[in-house]
């Protein structure tokens, strides 16, 4: 009886050990080789933002499955947000779980594998509430913008960053200050 009990216990223990699946945490570690941001100040006072990110995923990292972008405020509609990975449309566009206010792009089957490089594009069409009164001169408005960035625990290397502001049609070169 003792021998049979020991045999059953050993069999159950081996089954538990052999069928246990280790749970591995996601490790995001990547370089943003290039970030190009075009900010269009529209004549109706809204903003259109276009990003191009060239991302290299570290060989030791998990697949690069999501990318989050911070936005100036909450005055945007997710139906006006479009994304691409390597010029292929991204189906998952949602509210970011990590950046507030912000959006996330789920790369799904198009995730960037460890050691690979990919190009992520996003268009955020129509962010409202981005102009502010200029208290010194009521004929002017003020605006501010900061490009999206990633925490140092996730990113390494240098980034070639270009931010271009496109002013509304009709604004003359000597008018901005």
Per-range role (PLM):
Residues 21-177:
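Lumenal/extracellular ectodomains and adaptor appendage modules
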């Amino acid at each position: 009886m003792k021998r049979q009990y020991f045999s059953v216990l050993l069999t159950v223990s081996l089954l538990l050990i052999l069928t246990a699946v280790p749970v591995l945490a996601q490790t995001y570690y990547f370089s943003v080789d290039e970030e190009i941001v075009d900010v269009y100040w529209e004549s109706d006072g809204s903003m259109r933002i276009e990003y191009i990110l060239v991302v290299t995923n570290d060989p030791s990292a998990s697949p690069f499955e999501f990318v989050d972008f911070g936005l100036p405020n909450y005055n945007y509609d997710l139906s006006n947000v479009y994304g691409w990975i390597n010029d292929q449309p991204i189906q998952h566009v949602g509210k970011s779980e990590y950046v507030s206010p912000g959006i996330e792009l789920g790369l799904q089957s198009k995730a960037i594998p460890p050691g690979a490089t990919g190009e992520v594009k996003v268009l955020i069409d129509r962010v409202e509430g981005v102009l502010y009164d200029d208290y010194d001169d009521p004929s002017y408005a003020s605006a501010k913008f900061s490009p999206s960035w990633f925490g140092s625990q996730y990113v390494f290397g240098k980034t070639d960053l270009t931010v271009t502001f496109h002013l509304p049609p009709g604004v003359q070169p000597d008018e901005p200050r």
